[in-house]
């Protein structure tokens, strides 16, 4: 499949585990509209959804998108001088300050590896941008000051490969980033300089400003024989306020309440009521009328007692409750007492602190007759009663209130190129991988009234493979998508190759298009 999915290989002890963090998708064949005022977002692979009032920011496989009118129109930044064709790996904004991390893959020694390509910063809500290189170090080993009794040896990260920023948090004049091999870093001068954040090693539950410390700040020992600390492999960060910062790693959660002068370290092994697993890929905060709750996506790491799931704390991390055990959660969205959790198996909703959950089933847009074809979701956010969800098959909107319960009505937004004329057609994505995605056939009837449409798929030898629809009525004045899942009329998955599709509207001449299937 022609997609970039960051599969981070965590070398842990004598074994390894492969963990999918926030997925990045870069389909060069994915369709987009980059002009300002586009009715649709830039891409259909959405990894980040961030909302404040009517402003919505999306991180997609086709760059960054912004709406300032509740999703009615979008400004897309893909292929602009500042963003180029980079993937978006993280988005954060506060007021008019916006921070965006970008990434791509590089081929090295026969492997396709993730590489951080820097950050973009805007102080005027996305009107202008400053390009910042991915933070790297000059030396292989540095010495960092902690106090008069302690200096910390720190591994120097001299490459952007595997140094990819997965999360960003803004706290006052400070911006925090978590970049896996690049560790956690902070800048207080809008990205001109970056300092490594010193957090506890694996074997300590806290560090303070007066402690005598002996450890290495290093996510990997390597040839330099430094201490290997999974807690320094940083994946997620959240600013509860300007002083209280949470950092999630491959060894649990870290919390400071004084801007990094001291840290607490929470893990599965060190608390009576702990998190479910130590690999923390997302952190969020829910503020209700009576509670302040920290939520974390806590995935199993090295200990076989750990479980993937969601953990939440109502007392600042002293104790945790576990829920959605068995689910791989990617992020959180909130609406007062309600929490939304995008996972590999759809989006889960709870209004009672995880005691009960409602899971999205089939997502079908009754207006466009479109079905959401992917189960994985990576982003969730709300604007009043409107809930926005992002995943591998576009952007989804639903209403969640008493009169319109969550999931009772869906709107699916797919980025697509407008047809040059009503008699033309195209398919997307093309090529497509039938083992894990669908292809959409895009067309319009070109008729002034409802028309009968038949669509057939043929192989390279012009043998009939599938009749998608036959004499189906389609409305005028709009463009349609019909989904092909890469199966024939008997339900068998097709083989790689070139396929042709035929669209017949009423008794008009057939319209033809070509699809390349690669898996």
Indicate residue ranges for each PLM-predicted region.
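Beta-strand-rich domains and repeat architectures in extracellular enzymes and scaffolds
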Residues: 34-65
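C-terminal tail/sorting-segment detector
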Residues: 498-519
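Glycine-centered tight-turn motifs at strand-turn-strand junctions
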Residues: 464-494, 505-511
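Conserved beta-propeller blade signature
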Residues: 55-58, 98-99, 175-177, 185, ...
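Glycine-centered coil/turn sites that cap beta-strands in beta-rich domains
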Residues: 419-428, 432-456, 509
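Asp-box/BNR beta-propeller loop motif
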Residues: 21-37, 65-81, 116-136, 185-202, ...
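Surface-exposed loop and turn segments in beta-propeller and other repeat-based domains
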Residues: 35, 79-82, 131-159, 197-228, ...
């Amino acid at each position: 499949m022609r997609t970039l999915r960051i599969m981070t290989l965590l070398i842990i002890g004598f074994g390894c585990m492969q963990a999918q963090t926030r997925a990045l998708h870069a389909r060069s064949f994915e369709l987009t509209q980059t002009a300002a005022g586009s009715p649709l977002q830039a891409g259909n692979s959405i990894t980040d959804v961030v909302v404040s009032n009517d402003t919505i920011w999306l991180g997609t496989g086709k760059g960054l998108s912004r709406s300032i009118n509740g999703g009615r129109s979008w400004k897309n930044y893909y292929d602009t001088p500042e963003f180029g064709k980079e993937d978006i790996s993280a988005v954060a904004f506060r007021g008019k300050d916006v921070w965006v991390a970008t990434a791509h893959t590089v081929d090295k020694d026969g492997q396709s590896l993730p590489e951080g390509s820097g950050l973009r910063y805007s102080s005027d809500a996305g009107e202008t941008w400053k390009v910042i290189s991915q933070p790297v170090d000059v030396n292989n080993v540095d010495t960092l000051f902690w106090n008069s009794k302690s200096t910390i040896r720190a591994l120097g990260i001299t490459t952007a490969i595997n140094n990819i920023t997965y999360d960003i948090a803004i706290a006052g004049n400070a911006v925090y980033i978590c970049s896996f091999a690049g560790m956690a870093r902070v800048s207080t001068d809008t990205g001109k300089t970056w300092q490594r954040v010193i957090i506890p090693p694996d074997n300590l539950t806290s560090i303070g400003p007066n402690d005598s410390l002996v450890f290495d700040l290093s996510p990997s020992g390597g040839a330099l024989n430094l201490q290997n600390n999974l807690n320094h492999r940083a994946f997620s960060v959240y600013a509860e306020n300007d002083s209280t910062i949470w950092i999630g790693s491959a060894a649990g959660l870290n919390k400071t309440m004084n801007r990094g002068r001291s840290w607490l370290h929470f893990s599965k092994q060190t608390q009576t009521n702990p998190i479910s697993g130590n690999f923390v890929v997302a952190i969020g905060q829910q503020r209700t009328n009576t509670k302040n709750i920290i939520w974390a996506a806590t995935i199993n790491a090295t200990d076989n007692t750990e479980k993937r799931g969601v953990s939440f704390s109502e007392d600042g991390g002293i104790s945790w409750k576990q829920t959605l055990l068995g689910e791989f959660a990617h992020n959180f969205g909130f609406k007062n007492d309600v929490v939304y959790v995008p996972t590999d198996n759809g989006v889960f909703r709870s209004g009672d602190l995880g005691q009960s959950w409602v899971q999205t089933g089939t997502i079908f847009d009754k207006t466009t007759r479109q079905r959401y074809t992917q189960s994985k979701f990576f982003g969730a956010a709300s604007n009043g009663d409107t809930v926005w969800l992002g995943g591998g098959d576009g952007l989804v909107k639903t209403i969640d209130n008493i009169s319109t319960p969550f999931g009772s009505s869906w709107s699916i937004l797919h980025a697509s190129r407008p047809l040059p004329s009503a008699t033309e057609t195209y398919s997307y994505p093309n090529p497509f991988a039938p083992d894990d995605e669908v292809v959409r056939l895009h067309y319009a009837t070109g008729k002034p009234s409802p028309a009968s449409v038949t669509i057939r798929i043929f192989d390279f030898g012009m043998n009939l493979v599938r009749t998608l629809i036959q004499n189906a009525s389609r409305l005028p004045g709009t463009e349609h998508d019909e989904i092909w899942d890469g199966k024939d009329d008997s339900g068998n998955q097709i083989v790689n190759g070139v396929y042709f599709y035929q669209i017949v509207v009423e008794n008009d001449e057939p319209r033809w298009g070509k699809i390349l299937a690669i898996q």
